[in-house]
Amino acid sequence: MSSLYVPLVLRLEVRDRTKIVQSFIDDSKAGSESPLAGERTRQRLVKKGNTPPKKELKGREEDPPIGVMSSEPSHNYHKGRRTYSEVVIESLDGEKLVDSSSSVAGTSEKSGGRSVSEGPPDQVAYYSGNPLTEKTEGIMHFYKYNDEKLTKVAQCRMLCMYAVPAQVEVREIISFMCISLPMIVSIKVVRDPAPNQYMLIIKFKEHNDAVTFYEEFNNCPFNDLESYCCTLFFVDRIECTTSNDLFSSDDTSLTELPTCAVCLERMDDSVLAILCNHSFHARCLEQWADNTCPVCRYVQSPEVVAEQRCNDCGMSNDLWICLICGNIGCGRYAEQHAQRHWELTSHTYSLKVGGERVWDYAGDNYVHRLIENGADGKLVEYQRESNASFDDKNQKGGDKLEGIKLEYTLLLTSQLEDQRKYFEGLRHDMEQTMSKMEKTAYAQVENLEHQLTERSTELKSLKGDLDDTVTARKVAEKRATQTNEKVNKLANELKDEREINQMLRKDQQVWKGQVEKLIESQKTARTEYEKKIEDLQSQVNDLLMHFETQNKLKEQLDAGKITQEEITESQVELDSSSSSSRKLNRKKKK
């Protein structure tokens, strides 16, 4: 029940009209509550790492809350089947424990230092019984707060040492925690009906003393020889009340801690609730081999009652059971399977199922009235009557039944001999059957071994084929890898070539347009040049004619055939035929 700072409330429920145990009414609150005291204590315990690690469960992240109750007040409480047991409470004073532990060594010195002259006292006080021990009948309840605020503000000055094994005595516990005795105010030893264990309620002077004690001793072994550990939890207050007051109270701030149905311990942490709303410790439920709830299975599942039926026909009435082998058969007023069993096995006696009558098939009568006398071991006749006394039963025997006893002994011997022969026959048949089964098993084993050899050969060949296939697969994978590399390389080259071709096509279109433009411009320029050449050629012809005419006129002028005045006043005319012939001559020359 180890947990972090979770203060609990211990409540002793006593039987009605029973005296309240006044020593079990104590409130550890010092009167001043701090709203952050519980939170500081929780953080302190977390830093110390005092609590044992909880086992993590697959499929859930956190443990479900324990004992979640409705916030609305409810008075529909039912006591149910309640068993009140004896509860013994022993109170120990902390100061006396310290004094007794410190004065053990000096007891002899104090006794030796007493004055010899002192006489015995005149009056001595005495009391009857043990005033430190109180007994009552009740049930111990453990509660926790529903409201987290109450948990945070609680400053617990009490600790409960729970489930102390009976092998560890109280004096061993006191020596175990002797270092902390000066911090202890009182100790209450509570022995409830829990078998082989008890618990201690330790009250401290201050809240910090309780926390320090919890940090030092929680989950610590009591000694080095045994594996029992000290289990502590904080207690806010302890109460004692009657059952009527308990069930008539309107206190909804507390929730009672349930008890694990497996280990019978109180559940505080590592609690697992299943679909039927029954709660267990996680470690206890893990040890349950079945997949059903143990509580539901115990409460709801009835005991399996074997119904007696005839082994041959299944009839459930008028049944007789063989006293030798236990075979169950129907009577002679049904299918007579019990009599057939006697005919087959020679088992003479059968007992009426559900009755006390024994039938002898050999003598064809009842033999259940012959019993053996307890005084001398003789057989006597027994007649069962409803109101017969034990004395009447013993008075019916006599010496006259000595022969009946001998006859019964011989009959029993013969029946045992028949039984021996019958079972020897069964054993012989069983041996033959086992021999046949053994031979069949040997043949099956040989067949299985042959099949196993064939399967082993096939397996070896398949393994060889598998190795070859694996090798071929590796080679094919290598080739495929190389081919993929080549394909990737060629794809890259093809991509580059396509890009180059695309660029060349673009350049070709550009150059083609430029060539067409050049051709057109060349044609235009050629036409213009031809026109210019024709003009220039005509100008040259005119100049040549001018020069030729000028030379002729100069010659004629020199020869005196023409005068200067005639040249000035003359007009020169050219024929169109001559000009056209000149043009043709020019074209031919070209």
From Swiss-Prot:
A zinc finger (UBP-type) spans 294-386. This is BRCA1-associated protein homolog 2. Keywords: Cytoplasm, Metal-binding, Stress response, Transferase, Ubl conjugation pathway, Zinc, Zinc-finger. GO terms for biological process: positive regulation of gene expression; protein ubiquitination; Ras protein signal transduction; response to oxidative stress. GO terms for cellular component: cytoplasm. Pathway: Protein modification; protein ubiquitination. Acts as a Ras responsive E3 ubiquitin ligase. Controls the stress response to increased levels of reactive oxygen species (ROS) by modulating the brc-1-dependent expression of cki-1. Modulates expression of phase II detoxification genes such as gst-4, gst-7, sdz-8 and ugt-13, in a transcription factor skn-1-dependent manner. Residues 99-110 have a biased composition (Polar residues). Gene3D superfamilies: Zinc/RING finger domain, C3HC4 (zinc finger). It comes from Caenorhabditis elegans. The lineage of its organism: Eukaryota, Metazoa, Ecdysozoa, Nematoda, Chromadorea. A zinc finger (RING-type) spans 260-297. Zn(2+) 1 binds at residues 310, 313, 330, 337. Signal peptide: none annotated. Its EC number is 2.3.2.27. It is an enzyme of class 2 (transferase). Residues 53-63 have a biased composition (Basic and acidic residues). The keyword Coiled coil does not apply. It holds the Pfam family zf-RING_2.
